[in-house]
Curated annotation (Swiss-Prot):
Residues reported in the UniProt entry to bind ATP: 212, 231, 247-255, 296, 332, 448-449, 454
Principal subcellular localisation of the protein: cytoplasm
Gene that produces this protein: pckA
InterPro entries: PEP_carboxykinase_ATP, PEP_carboxykinase_C, PEP_carboxykinase_N, PEPCK_ATP_CS
Protein name, entry field: Phosphoenolpyruvate carboxykinase (ATP)
Species: Yersinia pseudotuberculosis serotype O:1b (strain IP 31758)
Similarity remark: Belongs to the phosphoenolpyruvate carboxykinase (ATP) family.
Compartments, record wording: Cytoplasm
Pathway linked to the protein: Carbohydrate biosynthesis; gluconeogenesis
Amino acid sequence: MSVKGITPQELAAYGIHNVSEIVYNPSYDLLFEEETKPTLEGYERGTLTTTGAIAVDTGIFTGRSPKDKYIVRDAITQDTVWWADQGKGKNDNKPLSQEIWSHLKGLVTEQLSGKRLFVVDTFCGANADTRLQVRFITEVAWQAHFVKNMFIRPSDEELARFEPDFIVMNGAKCTNPQWKEQGLNSENFVAFNLTERMQLIGGTWYGGEMKKGMFSMMNYLLPLKGIASMHCSANVGEKGDVAIFFGLSGTGKTTLSTDPKRKLIGDDEHGWDDDGVFNFEGGCYAKTIKLSEEAEPDIYHAIKRDALLENVVVLADGTVDFNDGSKTENTRVSYPIYHIDNIVKPVSKAGHATKVIFLTADAFGVLPPVSRLTANQTQYHFLSGFTAKLAGTERGVTEPTPTFSACFGAAFLSLHPTQYAEVLVKRMQAVGAQAYLVNTGWNGTGKRISIKDTRAIIDAILNGEIDKAETFTLPIFDLAVPMSLPGVNPDILDPRDTYADKAQWQEKAEDLAKRFATNFDKYTDTPAGAALVSAGPKI
C-alpha cells in the first residue's frame, strides 16, 4: 500500500460522503483475501480455481453494453465528437444532457456513499507526457483487481505525486429507474463527461466497460493532439523494427503478433506519437473460450495467481472448463502484462512502426492473401475495417456475413473516423512506413488460408522480402499482389487461381466491391472521405 492514500474530503469533492473505510491501491494479496471472503454474495464473490486465478461472474452483462453508452453534449464536445445522431455513420456516441448526467451522477454517488470503498490510481498510456492519470472508485474488490491488472501500475514515487486527470465511479449495483421518462435505452448506463473528466457506470458488472471506457477517452484526446490512437496489437524485432496489427475479432491479431522472434509491446490499444508506438495498458484481456495450452501457450500460462477469470465455468473441484460457453462465448481473463515472458520491458513502448498490417478474414473468397497498399488505399481500407465470417458450419451453401468496422474499432471511436485515418497516414509518411492488407480467410477452394502460409507472409513483410517481390495488379480492387514469396504456396497468391472458373471469382469480386462502396458512402459527407472513393474497388 502506498503512503499517500486518499482522504474522505477528496471523495466528498466527487459527491461521495460518509465513507466507512477507504482501501487505497490494495496489493494483490489483499485483493485475493477481499475477493474470496465467505461473507460475499452474488457477483461480488470470487471463486478460487486450480489455476491459482480467481473467477468471477458478471451476470447478464457478459460483454459491453453499447446501447447504454452516452456522452454529455456541451460546449467542449458539441463540434468534436462523432455523434450518433449526426451524419450518415452509425455509432454508439449518444448525446446526454447535463441535467440527466447530474441525475445519473447522483445515483452513483448515493450508491457509493456510506460504503467501504476501493480506490485504485492508475495510468492509461505508457508515455508520461500524454498518459491519463485515472482514479477508479468501486465498492467491489474484484473490480479494483481488474483495473490493477489492466492499467499501468504507478510506482510509490509516482503515487506520491498522483493527481487524477479522470475519475471513474463504478456503481454496478445501482440502476436508473427514470430511464423511460429521460428517453434513455434502459436502466443501465455507461456515461462520460469530458468537461468534468468523469465516467459513470450503473447496472452493468462487465469489467470491460472500465477498460474500453478509457480507450474511448484516449481516442478522443490523442488525435486532437496529432497522436494516433489505435485498436491494434504491436511488437518489436531484435533490430528495433516495430510492427502494428489491426484486425477485428477472429482475424488473428493476437495469434500473429505473438511471435517468439519478437517482443510484445501490447495486444489491444496503442498510441503513436513523436517518440514511437506505446501501449495504453498494463495488462491483457484475452478471450478464453476453447483455450488450450497447445494452441495458445502464452495465454494459457498467464492464467495463474493474480489473473482474474470472467464468466468461465468452474467445476466442483475448482478446475476450469474452457470449452464450456454456456454462460457466454465471450469468456475472458485479465492479467498483468508481465505474466507474458516475451515483452518489452520495463515500459511497454518502442520506436516508430515501419510495418502496418491490416488483418481481414474474407469469407467471400475474393481478396488475395497479401497485398501492398498505397497511401490512399491505406486510408480507404482502414476506414472500411472489413472482415467477414461464414454464417454457419452446416454442409451446403453458406452465405458469408460482411462486417465493416471503421478503423477496425468503430465501437470505441469518439471522433469522426477520417480523423484517425489522417493521423495514422501522417505518422506513417513521416517515417516511410508501409501498409499491407493480409487476408487470413478463405479462398476459392473453400479452405481457409493455412496459418503456416499466413505466418510466412507475415515473416516476408517483417523481413522486407515482400518489398523485393515482383507484383501484379488484381482487377476491381486494384491491389498490388506479390507473384511469389518465400515459404508461401505460390498457388494461393492470386485468388482467381483458386477457382475452377475465373468467372466465379469475377462475380464474387463484383458483389463484394458493391458492399465496400455501399459501406463507404457514409464517409463521403466529409471532403476527406469523398477524396478517398477512388482508392476503393472499381465496379
